[in-house]
Design a protein with these regions (language model features):
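Iron-associated oxidoreductase/ferritin-like identity signal
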Residues: 1-212
Length: 212
């Protein structure tokens, strides 16, 4: 079943006939009908691409640290890569459950070269802040369209992003304080849980194919 959302009158368009599109409703009778189309499914499809891109970037960061023989940092970002992949698949499942089309996009090549050990974490923090803004935009769009189900679904991601920004900020502070003594960072990560440790949270949305 397609989702139906109400938009402000200024966003309505009248048309004569034509095939029904995703996430719309027709009002009126006769040849002239009013069509209301939700913009949220397309925006969620776009966010799927952002989540996969984030996962791809975290793989590149993990490989960088692995090559530098920093196994704790590498393991942290391998977990982050899986987590972002899971987020993408949660969005996929949301669209599938809503009866919407899913368009899995390609992703741009990630950054693979870094000038120092802190740069990858700086990049990761900037990425998490960007994703937070993107999710906030989706929540606002759902609210504009009076899509209460979509807004409730997306609030989990907002909470998750707050935690991600906080944990990545903490990791960056540790890396910067350590300077060239990166074994101190390795020791810190071996003794302290920073971010999610791999298992999906109990209240996490279902992921298409199952979370890894």
């Amino acid at each position: 079943m397609r989702n139906v959302f109400l938009l402000p009158v200024g966003q309505l368009t009248a048309e004569r006939g034509g095939p029904e599109a995703a996430s719309l409703v027709f009002w009126g009778t006769g040849a002239t009908r009013v069509r209301v189309v939700s913009r949220l499914p397309a925006a969620v499809n776009e966010q799927i691409g952002h989540e996969f891109a984030a996962s791809h970037q975290y793989v590149a960061i993990a490989v960088y640290y692995d090559a530098e023989t920093l196994p704790q940092l590498a393991a942290h970002f391998y977990r982050q890569a899986v987590e972002e992949r899971n987020h993408a698949m949660m969005l996929v499942q949301y669209l599938l459950d809503a009866g919407e089309d899913v368009a899995v996009p390609g992703v741009a090549e990630p950054q693979t070269s870094f000038s120092n050990a802190a740069e990858p974490v700086e990049l990761a923090l900037a990425q998490e802040k960007t994703v937070t803004q993107q999710i906030a935009g989706l929540v606002e769009l759902a609210r504009q369209e009076n899509d209460l189900v979509g807004e409730q679904f997306l609030h989990w991601f907002l909470k998750e992003q707050r935690e991600e920004v906080s944990s990545m900020s903490a990791l960056l502070a540790v890396v910067k304080r350590a300077g060239d003594s990166l074994l101190l960072v390795e020791d810190f990560l071996s003794r302290n849980a920073v971010g999610d440790q791999g298992a999906p949270e109990a209240d996490a949305p279902a992921a298409a194919g199952g979370a890894l």
